[in-house]
Every structure is written in C-alpha cells, then in structure tokens.
Regions:
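Loop-to-helix entry region at the N-terminal start of transmembrane alpha-helices
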Residues: 16-24, 71-99, 139, 183, ...
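Hydrophobic alpha-helical transmembrane segments of polytopic membrane proteins
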Residues: 168-204
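Cytoplasmic-entry segments and transmembrane alpha-helices of multi-pass inner-membrane transporters
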Residues: 39-72, 92, 97, 102-106
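Alpha-helical membrane-interface segments at transmembrane helix boundaries
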Residues: 12-23, 54-61, 73, 77, ...
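Transmembrane alpha-helix signature in integral membrane proteins
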Residues: 14-42
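Short cytosolic juxtamembrane segments of multi-pass membrane proteins
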Residues: 206-215
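Short cytoplasmic-facing helical segments at TM-TM junctions of multi-pass membrane proteins
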Residues: 103-142
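Transmembrane alpha-helices
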Residues: 127-159, 186
Length: 215
C-alpha cells in the first residue's frame, strides 16, 4: 500500500521520468532502425559482409551494459558530453543494432528466389523489388527485431541513470541510495508497464503495416 500511495502522490514526477525514458529509448532505437535496416539490406546483397557485420554487432551485445555506459564516458568527454543523454543514447543505439540487422538479413535472405526472379521478369529494378516486394514480405520479421530492441532496451536504459541520463532508472538509483523500497518498486513497475505497452503498440502497428495477404 505504501508503494501505491507513493506512486499516487508522485504521479507527475513519475510521468515526467516515463516520458524522458520513452524519448531516450525511441530516439536510440529509431537511429538503429535508420542504420540497421539498410545495413541488413547491404549484407544480403553483399553476402561476404554478413559474417563480419553480424559478428561485430553480436560482440557489442555481449558487453555488459554498465561497462558499455562506462566506456562512453571518456569517449564523449572529448566533446564535453561525458555524462548525460548523448552517451546513453549511443550505447543503446549500439545494443539495438543486432536484433534489427539480424532480423532484416534473415527475413530478406530467406525469401523465395522465385519472388526476385518474378520481379526481374516484369522489369523491376533492384530498388523497386526491394520497395514493393521484398520489404513488405519481410516486414513481420523485421518488426520482430524492432520490438525485441525496444523491449530489451527499456530495461537497459534504466541503467543509464548512473551516467546522468535520467529516466525511470533514477527511481532505482535513488531507491537503492536511500534504501527506499517504495521507489524501487515504483521504478520496476513503471519500467515493466512501459515495456508491455510499447510492445503491444508496436504489435498493432506491425499488423497495420503488414500486407493483408501475409498476415
């Protein structure tokens, strides 16, 4: 009950931290989509690049999050941004690349060869086939990677509070520092709720964007 009262009494503060957390995650994952999907297309077209690119993305994901955030501090200190949102967004961007690149590569690489041949047969260019045939067919799997990146990094971004990024991780950090169980539970609950709601919204968006014939 104490936790519920705490959340009700601090609803405005919780809302501010939630929107801050959401903005940080969506910006990082959005950048990863802009880079990761074209990178996935590139390694399908140039297959020799697949192993090094996916290997490097996998290597980044194996670095413990607290260590990666720590590595960002001296790097961004060179431009006067050692703590705050910029190093946190960069770290989460790097974490987001693997599921997006891998799912894009897997989805496009597993399409039936006859699909591409049919496109060539009617005179489509590579970009036309990609835009009108291949991406729509691969969209459910690509979206699966995006959803994985978002849900995974909602939790990862909470750790970014230790480098001054803000967000819901502040509740966990301050709760631990002050031995306040209410803040710890409130932070954990809000992070879980945010992950569940975003995953549901992305699932609905995936359904809306996927062609009816392959739903």
């Amino acid at each position: 009950m104490d936790t519920i009262h705490y959340m009700m009494d601090n609803a405005g503060y919780l809302a501010t931290l939630t929107f801050q957390h959401l903005w940080l995650v969506l910006l990082a994952v959005g950048l990863a989509i802009l880079i990761g999907v074209p990178l996935g297309v590139l390694i399908v077209r140039h297959k020799w690049l697949a192993t090094p690119v996916l290997g490097l993305a996998t290597l980044v994901l194996t670095i413990p999050s607290i260590a990666l955030f720590g590595l960002m501090i001296p790097l961004f200190s060179l431009v006067g941004q050692g703590i705050g949102a910029l190093p946190a967004i960069t770290a989460v961007f790097l974490y987001s690349l693997l599921p997006i690149v891998r799912n894009t590569h897997t989805a496009l690489d597993s399409l039936p060869p006859g699909l591409r041949e049919a496109g060539r047969g009617i005179g489509m260019t590579f970009w036309q086939r990609l835009r009108w045939v291949e991406i729509p067919m691969a969209l459910p799997v690509i979206f699966g990677g995006i959803r994985t990146a978002v849900v995974m990094n909602i939790g990862v971004m909470a750790i970014a509070a230790v480098i001054g990024a803000g967000g819901l991780g502040l509740l966990l950090l301050n709760g631990i520092g002050g031995s306040d169980i209410r803040m710890l539970i409130a932070g954990a609950v809000m992070i879980c709720l945010l992950a569940v709601v975003l995953d549901w919204l992305l699932h609905r968006l995936q359904i809306a964007l996927t062609p009816k014939g392959i739903r």
